[in-house]
C-alpha cells in the first residue's frame, strides 16, 4: 500500500467512500477490508457509517483553522451522512442560545427514516419529517460546497412539531417553564417566520402552540 499517496489524497477530500479507497489503494474484497480495518486501527481513518470515512489528518487541519470552520465541517458531514437532510432541532436552538444547554449531538431533519450514527467526532442524529415540511433551511458554504441548516424559526417549528404533548396545559407548561426556552433570543423576523410556518402547516397541535405563544405574548 502506498500510504504517502493515500495521505495526499485524503487531505484533499472532506470524506471518502470505501469504493474510492479501493481505487486509491488498488485493493478489493477481503484485501480492501483488511486495509480499511488497519487504517481505522492506526487512527488514519475515522468511520462515519458503513462504507464512509473521514481522515484524521483532514479533520485536524480543519479544526486548527478555527472553531467556526470545524463547526461548518461537522454540518457538512451531517448533510452528507444521510441525504437529503438539513441541520435543525436542538443543535440550532442551542447554538442560537434559545436552549440553555449545549447540544452534544448534531441534530438533523431528513426525509429518510430516523437514525443515529455515533462516531469518534460526535453523534449525528436524524429525525424524519413529512415532505411538505422539508423547507426553511439556509444555504451556507464550506470549502465551496453547500451546507444546509435551519433558521431559528424553522428549528423551533421542527422541534415542537416532532415533540409529543398530551394536552394544551402540557404545551403551556413546557414553553413557559420546563422547556427553559430563552424566548428573548427571537427577533421580530424570527417571530413572524415562526407564526407563518405554524399557520401554513395546518397542524392542529401547532395551531394550539401558536395560540399559547400569542396568549403568553411570546410572539
Annotate each predicted stretch with a short phrase.
Residues 1-81:
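Short beta-edge/loop segments at beta->alpha junctions of small alpha/beta modules
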Residues 15, 86, 150:
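Short aromatic/basic micro-patch
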Residues 18, 89, 152-153:
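Structural motif detector for alpha-helix initiation sites
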Residues 26, 40, 97, 161-165:
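Hydrophobic/aromatic-lined pockets within catalytic cores
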Residues 28, 99-100, 204:
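Short coil/loop linkers at secondary-structure junctions
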Residues 47-52, 57, 70-120, 126-130:
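Short gly/ser-rich loop at a beta-strand->alpha-helix junction or flexible surface loop bordering the NTP-binding
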Residues 117, 122-149:
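A contiguous pocket-lining binding segment that forms or flanks enzyme active sites
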Residues 137-219:
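Hydrophobic alpha-helical interaction segments
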Amino acid at each position: 500500500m502506498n500510504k504517502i499517496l493515500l495521505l495526499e489524497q485524503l487531505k484533499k477530500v472532506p470524506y471518502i467512500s470505501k469504493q474510492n479507497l479501493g481505487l486509491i489503494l488498488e485493493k478489493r474484497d477481503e484485501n480492501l477490508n483488511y486495509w480499511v480495518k488497519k487504517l481505522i486501527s492506526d487512527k488514519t481513518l475515522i468511520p462515519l457509517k458503513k462504507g464512509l470515512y473521514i481522515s484524521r489528518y483532514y479533520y485536524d487541519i480543519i479544526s486548527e483553522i478555527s472553531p467556526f470552520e470545524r463547526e461548518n465541517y461537522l454540518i457538512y458531514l451531517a448533510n452528507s451522512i444521510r441525504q437529503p437532510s438539513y441541520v435543525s432541532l436542538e443543535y440550532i436552538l442551542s447554538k442560537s442560545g434559545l436552549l440553555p444547554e449545549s447540544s452534544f449531538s448534531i441534530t438533523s431533519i431528513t426525509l429518510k427514516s430516523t437514525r443515529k450514527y455515533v462516531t469518534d467526532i460526535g453523534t449525528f442524529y436524524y429525525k424524519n419529517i413529512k415532505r411538505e415540511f422539508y423547507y426553511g433551511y439556509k444555504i451556507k458554504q464550506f470549502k465551496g460546497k453547500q451546507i444546509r441548516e435551519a433558521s431559528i424559526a424553522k428549528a423551533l417549528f421542527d422541534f415542537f412539531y416532532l415533540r409529543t404533548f398530551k394536552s394544551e396545559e402540557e404545551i403551556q407548561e413546557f414553553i413557559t417553564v420546563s422547556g427553559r426556552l430563552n424566548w428573548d433570543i427571537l427577533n421580530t423576523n424570527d417571530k413572524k417566520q415562526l407564526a407563518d410556518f405554524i399557520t401554513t402547516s395546518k397542524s392542529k397541535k401547532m395551531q394550539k402552540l401558536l395560540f399559547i405563544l400569542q396568549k403568553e405574548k411570546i410572539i
